[in-house]
């Protein structure tokens, strides 16, 4: 089966999204293993692989993957080289710099959903792995098609899936606050709650000096799902035009958020909440606009701190269904890559399988602190470990594709959104709505008009 994707709309056209079904591809041949794990017959001896990553660092997941790989291949050494930039985009910059200096690790990751995948391909930084997949006999249907589809560009495969979810598609709610106010919570898989109702609840739940009714991040994932919740979008599918002035629904979406943040002041200003999950665990916010990973994090925090249900109980309120039947979301995913020109690419490929296989993916979720709904077997294991994971399947079944800047200006794109969305929503130094929205639009459009990265 051929997987095709473009930088303009990296999920558009995949069979899963078009059909709205979360199904794995039918297997076409017997895989070399049943779980995407490594084949000890396919590696060279005395090999050292350098693994440059910022994912999972400090959790023990990376070390566990290295140790178990060493058990399979005693003559192969994997050197973990953590990336510790102040942001994810900083870490991509570090990898570009390392490549320019001839020091990029054999194992790296230029994620599609952070808009670096196609740039890394165009700059000849990461290599296609089709021949390695074919020689290995790997069955790519072990991964869900939507996330395997992200690994392809111009008909060639460049990686294996790492993380994947449906983006900032939910309000993570403290059910105890709702119950205390007599507000009936919707079912966690329902899309029946309007944005108008969310706004009313945010005002009702807000307590001046005690807690905020709603917390909203100023970042690209939130900007996109905000506009989609109102039936609009942030940029076009081609990745060339910012829509927030021309699309009346997108304009209405930002007006709604501006009213809550600047006029009603029920949303915290930037800096007043350092960690959204921690603030919600502590009861400082009643709702947080996030995603499935945030739901899981808050539930884990509540349990680890033995917080009573009458004080804090995690709940999920999904964004509303759109007129076309799609659910407001932004299907996003990551990748594991091999550096172009790696001397031992066959051995590196075995390590890719080891971290992206069933056991690696389960650990990536439960230990590594990521959300990776990228494999049916791993997702089923997560549901068995905690049924809350069933809440997240519905939006994977009928989610919306993400749109990427056509010029691969990922860092500039995300930075512009964060900077000017922050200014627009600043209740301490108020900018008139029309002026702030114009500035956000113009600076995002300026990035989209840049030459390719």
Predicted regions and their residues:
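Long, aromatic- and glycine/proline-rich binding clefts that accommodate carbohydrate-like moieties
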Residues: 313-318, 365-419, 423, 451-453
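Extracytoplasmic/periplasmic solute-binding protein
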Residues: 153-169, 179, 195-243, 249-250, ...
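Conserved N-terminal structural module of periplasmic/extracytoplasmic solute-binding proteins
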Residues: 2-123, 136-141, 324-325, 346-347, ...
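Short helix-initiation/N-cap motifs at beta->coil->alpha
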Residues: 83-94, 192-197, 269-282
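Extracytoplasmic/periplasmic substrate-recognition and gating elements
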Residues: 47, 71-72, 77-79, 101, ...
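Glycine-centered hinge/linker elements that transmit conformational signals in sensory
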Residues: 199-204, 239-271, 315, 319-320
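Hinge/lid segment of periplasmic solute-binding proteins
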Residues: 37, 111-167, 311-319, 384
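Short, solvent-exposed loop/beta-turn-alpha elements that line the ligand-binding surface or hinge
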Residues: 130-143, 187-191, 232-253, 302-310, ...
């Amino acid at each position: 089966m051929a997987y095709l994707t473009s930088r303009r709309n990296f999920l558009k056209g995949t069979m899963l999204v078009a059909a709205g079904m979360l199904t794995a591809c039918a297997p076409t041949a017997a895989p070399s293993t049943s779980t995407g794990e490594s084949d000890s017959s396919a590696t060279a001896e005395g090999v050292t692989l350098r693994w440059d990553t910022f994912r999972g660092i400090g959790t023990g997941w990376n070390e566990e993957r290295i140790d178990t790989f060493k058990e399979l291949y005693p003559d192969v050494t994997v050197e973990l080289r953590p990336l510790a930039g102040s942001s994810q985009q900083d870490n991509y910059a570090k990898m570009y710099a390392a490549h320019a200096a001839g020091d990029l690790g054999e194992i790296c990751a230029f994620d599609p959903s952070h808009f670096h995948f196609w740039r890394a391909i165009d700059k000849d930084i990461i290599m296609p792995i089709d021949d390695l997949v074919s020689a290995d006999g790997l069955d790519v249907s072990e991964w869900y098609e939507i996330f395997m589809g992200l690994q392809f560009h111009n008909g060639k495969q460049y990686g294996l899936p790492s993380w994947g979810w449906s983006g900032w598609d939910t309000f993570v709610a403290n059910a105890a606050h709702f119950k205390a106010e007599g507000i009936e919570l919707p079912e966690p898989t329902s899309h029946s709650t309007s944005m108008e109702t969310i706004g009313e609840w945010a005002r009702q739940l807000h307590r001046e000096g005690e807690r905020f009714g709603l917390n909203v991040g100023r970042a690209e994932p939130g900007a996109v799902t905000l506009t989609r919740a109102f039936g609009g979008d942030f940029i076009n599918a081609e990745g060339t035009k910012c829509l927030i002035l021309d699309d009346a629904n997108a304009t209405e979406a930002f007006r709604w958020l501006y009213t809550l943040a600047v006029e009603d002041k029920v949303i915290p200003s930037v800096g007043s909440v350092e960690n959204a999950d921690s603030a919600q665990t502590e009861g400082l916010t009643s709702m947080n606009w996030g995603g499935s990973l945030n739901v899981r994090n808050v539930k884990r925090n509540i349990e680890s701190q033995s917080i009573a249900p009458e004080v804090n109980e995690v709940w999920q309120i999904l964004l509303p269904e759109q007129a076309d039947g799609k659910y407001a979301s932004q299907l996003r995913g990551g990748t594991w890559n091999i550096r172009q020109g790696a001397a031992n690419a066959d051995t590196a490929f075995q390590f890719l399988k080891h971290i992206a296989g069933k056991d690696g993916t389960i650990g990536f979720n439960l230990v590594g602190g990521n959300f990776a709904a990228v494999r049916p077997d791993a997702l089923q294991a997560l549901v068995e470990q905690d049924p809350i994971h069933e809440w997240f399947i519905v939006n994977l079944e009928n989610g919306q594709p993400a749109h990427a800047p056509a010029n691969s200006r990922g860092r500039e794109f995300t930075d512009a959104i964060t900077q000017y969305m922050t200014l627009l929503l600043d209740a301490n130094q108020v900018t008139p709505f029309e002026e702030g929205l114009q500035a956000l639009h113009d600076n995002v459009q300026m990035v989209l008009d840049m030459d390719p990265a």
